[in-house]
Each structure stands twice: as structure tokens, then as C-alpha cells.
Curated annotation (Swiss-Prot):
It comes from Prochlorococcus marinus (strain MIT 9303). This is 1-deoxy-D-xylulose-5-phosphate synthase. It catalyses: D-glyceraldehyde 3-phosphate + pyruvate + H(+) = 1-deoxy-D-xylulose 5-phosphate + CO2. GO terms for biological process: 1-deoxy-D-xylulose 5-phosphate biosynthetic process; isopentenyl diphosphate biosynthetic process, methylerythritol 4-phosphate pathway; terpenoid biosynthetic process; thiamine biosynthetic process. GO terms for cellular component: cytosol. The gene is dxs. Homodimer. The lineage of its organism: Bacteria, Bacillati, Cyanobacteriota, Cyanophyceae, Synechococcales.
């Protein structure tokens, strides 16, 4: 069957193993063709092609439910659920999303983007099914990295106490998350995966049974359970963790052997309670470069299929904020042995892979465990260490209670570096870093800041480490501004003090973080239109520099705030509340992300859609204050502050 003709997963029913293997070949070809052109997640999807086909041949996707954890491995799923023709629009504005979205397809049974949620969601569907007296199957597909997440373990604990609820968990064990997984559970899975006795027993049972004359060289599906029982008798540790938690354990099995997986899944569906099928796969399967470098090819920008190398970008770019952070932290760690970098399975993305290589004794990876990471850091701070937790803004949301309860209330000196803060682009709404400003505003004792460029990032990191309390620093995705960097001798900033970058009497612009350079360009455009603006680099969200902002707001009489974050409870709201509390009641216009989700697109396309480019902001400001009809406001008296 041609992949282009496969528009419904139920078309897999009745295909022979050879035909399924041919479909698998076509999926890999299309997967590589599109991702090499437009970029996207590569290794995860290549690793689950056979798993997807084998599982779907045993299900009726018009009725049964499958929840893919995270969703970045679901490109094969998308290719066989009616999106083959549009797949070349992957992760592009208005095109196929890089993750699962319920609004995109009826076969995307649960949306995701963050790890470890699949078992809870699929179990919830099973509970609803039982209450309604229905009979559809519920399946969660989760990776070994995501299985270390607390919510996944909580769900397994719950499911194990529902012995009469049919429910299948497929453990996609590729010994990777984005980076290699860590922890005791991962070590246990690794022992199971590579256990020589397990492989010997499995192979011996199958070969002996197949050799019986009346078997015809085939192994009945029902004997898979017998194989599992024999393995557990001979090697008690295999599957013991899951068996003790109430699951029937089956595996480990080869995740690229379609025939064996089909038999195993058919058997698993017949078990009357929770079942875990342990499938061992190779991340990046079928593309040698991705198999050899599973971290580097987890996700890729456009690349050359023949050489595997990324296509050259246009022009030389400054180093990314993540790289500047990582290199600066290395030097600070070398100067102070009490500084420790912590990541939650995102070393490469946050720049901490540099620290891991340079100063490994001052580096910790806790796995996909954001809540634990925050409280671990709190405990370390209690004993005099200086933990620096580098984490994506969107993932830190998962540890909001720990930020309050374990760090904020106790006023502990923990530094949080929130990478990918603001608009991130093609990963879409699950990954936009638009909420951290709002949620950090509400936590007492925190000092919160954002740099205007990479040099200010260096100074802010030093400021955080010298501060005797919790501090949070947000940095955007992508390259810096290209300003000169200092190798050492960074001076800390005065806490809660901003700076004036340019002066004008018509308008006050107060910008935060990545929006400061955009504010300066906007001010230039306004000046060309006859409107002269003062621009403040706020630097700090908590505490806000009221001593700088309030007098200028009173004198100038028009205030614009700029942020790349949610307007609801955001930086602009903080400025407005501060002015209002001191009876500085001047017209104010807040620019940021409105109360909406930001869908997948390039960062530039997202900013254009939100009206956040300098040209758009200049036009919006003039329209809001009715300035575009006035050739110049220079010399005019500013509006007086209102009184109550």
C-alpha cells in the first residue's frame, strides 16, 4: 500500500507483516524528507514507526483511544491519520502542528507537549468508559524518560489499584528522553533491557515452541504470557516494579519487530486489568546519523539528508542567550565551588551541557522532575550551596507550588534561569514562555529580572548569586544582540533599579527584557513621526523601580509598557498597579501578549500576528494616543495627573 493512499489508520487492518514493513519504510522516507527541509523532531518519530503500525493494527481508532506522551514522537501517527498531504507544512504557520492537538484531528485523542501526562489522561478515559458501560480500549504510550516524571508514577500507582479496569501502557524504552535519562528507575530499565538471561529465556522458549511440528513455525499470541511468566520465575527482577504496582508486565520486546509486537498487543488486550508492555526501540532508527547522535538529532533545523549536517544559516549570528548563560556559569562555578547548576533533563537546551563537560562535579540532572528539582535546590540552599536551576519557562509552571512553598515562603537563595521565556515559535502553545512574569509576580520574597542583552545577562547572573534570597532571571530563545561580552569581573546590578536609555518629552516607554531593543527601535520610528519618547530599561519586575518610573510618568503624562509575556497579571499590569497605588493616574497603554494562545509559527510570524514588531508598535501607540494626527508634540504641555 502506498502511504499517500493511507488516510485512515483502520486501513492497516489486514495488511501482512511484509506490507506493514513497506509502510514503515515509506513513513521514514517521508519523515526524513519533511524534517530535513523544514526542521522538527527527528529521532523520536523515527524510533516508533514499527511500534505505531503494530499497535494500530490491533486497534479500531474510530472507537479506541491512544494517548501519546509529549507528542513529539507522533509524526508517524500523523502520517497515517489523514495528514500525509499536508505534512510538508509541519510546524509552519497554519500548517500541521508539531505536537498532538485535539482540534487538528479526531485521532489526536489528547493534546500534549509536556512530558509524563499520558498515563493519567488515558486512565481518565478508561474510568469514563467504565462508568458509561462502554468497551473501547485505552492506551498510553510513554517513553522511559517521561516515566521518571512524578505525575506518571502517580498514575501508575492509581491504575495498579484498579485491577478490573482494562488499560494498556506501552513503555517506549529507547534509553533517552532528550538527553539520556537519569535515576534509579532508568538504571533498573537498563538492566532489564540488556539482561542476558532475559534474552536467552525469551529466545529459547520461542525457538523451541516454534520447532514443534504442529506449530507450523508460528508462536501463538497466548504463549507470550507464558514467556513472561517464565522470565519472571528465572529472573525475579524483570518487571517486578510494575508487577508489584498491580500491572501485568510483558516484555521487554524488540520495538522494531512488527510481528512480535502485534502478537504481544493482541495478548495484552485480552488481559482484564492494567497491562504494561515494555518495548525497546532505537531513537533515530533508520537514519545512521540520528542513531549515532541521539541527542543532537532529537530535534533538528533544516539539514542535508546526505551529510546529516545543518544547512548554513544566513549570516553570522551572535551567540545564543543559552550559550552565554552556560559559559558564564562555568566561570562562576570555577570561582566558587558552592555554585551548582541543576537541570531537569534539558541540559543541551539550557546551555548546561557546557557546564556538564567543564565542571561535572558542579552539575546535576534530575531527569524530567521539575517539582523535585525546585525542592532539591531549596534543600541545597539550606546547607549553604548556591543552586542555579536552568529550566524552560513553560516547564517551570509545573513546579509552581514548590516555588511558593519550598523557596518563596522560606526566602531561600535559589537562582532560577528561565530559558525560552516569551515567544518560542514552531513548538506552539504548549511551549510558549508567556506566563512566568504573571506567576512570579505573585510570589513573595522573589527578586525577578530580565536582561536587555547578553552582557546584562552576565551581570544579572552575578546579581542573583550574590542576592540573599530567591531570584529569577528570564532569557529568550535565540541569539543575543551581539554586544561585547566581559570574560570576568562582572559587576552586580543594584536590585530594583532600571535605567533611562533615551529621553523625550512626549511619551514614556517602560520596557522589560527582550522588548527593550524593540522599544529603542520603536522610539526611533516615533521620532521620525514627530513623537519623542523616553525609554526605560526596567531590568526588574520585582522590585519595580518606582523611584525612576513614577516621576517620569507624572511629568510626561503618557505611559507605554512593553513585554513579551501575558498581559494578564504581567509587567504592564505591575506598572499600572504601581502608578495607581501612588495616585499617578496617567493614560497608559500596555503592549504584550493578549489573553489568547500563541499557535505554532516562526517567532517573527508570531510577533507580527500579535502586533509586537517595532513598526506595528509605533503605529499602535500613535493610534492609541491619537498622536498620528499631530506633526509634533515637542514643547506641548504634558497632560496633568488626575487627582482623586
Amino acid at each position: 500500500m502506498r502511504l499517500s493512499e493511507l488516510t485512515h489508520p483502520n486501513q492497516l487492518h489486514g495488511l501482512s507483516i511484509a506490507e506493514l514493513e513497506d509502510v514503515a519504510r515509506q513513513i521514514r522516507e517521508r519523515h526524513l524528507e519533511v524534517v530535513s527541509t523544514s526542521g522538527g523532531h527527528l529521532g523520536p518519530g523515527l524510533g516508533v514507526v514499527e511500534l505505531t503500525l503494530a499497535l494500530y493494527q490491533t486497534l479500531d481508532l474510530d472507537h479506541d483511544r491512544v494517548v501519546w506522551d509529549v507528542g513529539h514522537q507522533a509524526y508517524p501517527h500523523k502520517l497515517i491519520t489523514g495528514r500525509y498531504g499536508d505534512f510538508n507544512t509541519l510546524r509552519q504557520q497554519g500548517g500541521v502542528a508539531g505536537y498532538l492537538k485535539r482540534c487538528e484531528s479526531s485521532f489526536d485523542h489528547f493534546g500534549a507537549g509536556h512530558a509524563s501526562t499520558s498515563i493519567s489522561a488515558a486512565l481518565g478515559m478508561a474510568v469514563a468508559r467504565e462508568r458509561r458501560g462502554e468497551s473501547f480500549k485505552c492506551v498510553a504510550v510513554i517513553g522511559d524518560g517521561a516515566l521518571t516524571g512524578g505525575i506518571a508514577l502517580e498514575a501508575i500507582n492509581h491504575a495498579g489499584h484498579m485491577p478490573n479496569t482494562p488499560f494498556l501502557v506501552v513503555l517506549n524504552d529507547n534509553d533517552m528522553s532528550i538527553s539520556p535519562p537519569v535515576g534509579a528507575l532508568s538504571t533498573h530499565l537498563n538492566r532489564m533491557r540488556h539482561s542476558a538471561p532475559v534474552q536467552f529465556i525469551s529466545d529459547s522458549v520461542e525457538e523451541r515452541v516454534k520447532s514443534l511440528p504442529f506449530m507450523g513455525g508460528e508462536l501463538p499470541a497466548e504463549l507470550d504470557l507464558l514467556k513472561g511468566s517464565m522470565r519472571r520465575l528465572s529472573v525475579p527482577k524483570v518487571g517486578a516494579v510494575f508487577e508489584e504496582l498491580g500491572f501485568t508486565y510483558m516484555g521487554p520486546i524488540d520495538g522494531h519487530d512488527i510481528e512480535r509486537m502485534v502478537r504481544t498487543f493482541e495478548t495484552a488486550h485480552k488481559v482484564g486489568g492494567p497491562v504494561l508492555v515494555h518495548v525497546v526501540t532505537t531513537k533515530g532508527k533508520g537514519y545512521p546519523y540520528a542513531e549515532a547522535d541521539q541527542v543532537g538529532y532529537h530535534a533538528q533545523s533544516a539539514f542535508d539528508l546526505i551529510t546529516g549536517k545543518a544547512l548554513p544559516s544566513k549570516g553570522k549570528k551572535p551567540p545564543s542567550y543559552s550559550k552565554v548563560f552556560g559559559e558564564t556559569l562555568i566561570k562562576l562555578c570555577q570561582q566558587d565551588s558552592t555554585v551548582v547548576g541543576i537541570t531537569a533533563a534539558m541540559a543541551t537546551g539550557t546551555g548546561l551541557d557546557l557546564l556538564q563537560k567543564a565542571v561535572p562535579e558542579q552539575y546535576i540532572d534530575v531527569g524530567i522532575a521539575e517539582q523535585h528539582a525546585v525542592t532539591l535546590a531549596a534543600g541545597m540552599a539550606c546547607e549553604g550551596l548556591k543552586p542555579v536551576l536552568a529550566i524552560y519557562s513553560t516547564f517551570l509552571q509545573r513546579a509552581f507550588d514548590q516555588l511558593i512553598h519550598d523557596v518563596g515562603i522560606q526566602n531561600l537563595p535559589v537562582t532560577f534561569v528561565m530559558d525560552r521565556a516569551g515567544i518560542v515559535g514552531a513548538d506552539g502553545p504548549t511551549h510558549q514562555g508567556q506566563y512566568d512574569i504573571s506567576y512570579f509576580r505573585a510570589i513573595p520574597n522573589f527578586t525577578v529580572m530580565a536582561p536587555k542583552d547578553e552582557a546584562e545577562l552576565q551581570r544579572m547572573l552575578v546579581t542573583c548569586l550574590q542576592h540573599q534570597g530567591p531570584a529569577a532571571l528570564r532569557i529568550p530563545r535565540g541569539s543575543g544582540e551581539g554586544v561585547p561580552l566581559l570574560d570576568e569581573g562582572w559587576e552586580p546590578l543594584a536590585i530594583g533599579r532600571g535605567e533611562v536609555l533615551c529621553e523625550g518629552d512626549d511619551l514614556l516607554i517602560v520596557a522589560y527584557g527582550v522588548m527593550v531593543p524593540a522599544a529603542m527601535i520603536t522610539a526611533q520610528l516615533l521620532q521620525e513621526a514627530g513623537v519623542k519618547a523616553t525609554v526605560i530599561n526596567a531590568r526588574f519586575l520585582r522590585p519595580l523601580d518606582q523611584a525612576l518610573i513614577h516621576p517620569l510618568a507624572r511629568r510626561i503624562g503618557r505611559v507605554v509598557t512593553m513585554e513579551e509575556g501575558a498581559l494578564a497579571g504581567g509587567f504592564g499590569a505591575a506598572v499600572v498597579e504601581s502608578l495607581s497605588d501612588q495616585d499617578v493616574l496617567v493614560p497608559t497603554f500596555r503592549i504584550g501578549i493578549p489573553d489568547q494562545l500563541v499557535d505554532h509559527a516562526s517567532p517573527q510570524q508570531s510577533r507580527e500576528a500579535l502586533g509586537l514588531t517595532p513598526t506595528q508598535m509605533s503605529e499602535r501607540i500613535q493610534e492609541h494616543f491619537c498622536l498620528n494626527s499631530q506633526p509634533s508634540l515637542v514643547g506641548q504641555e504634558a497632560p496633568q495627573a488626575l487627582s482623586t
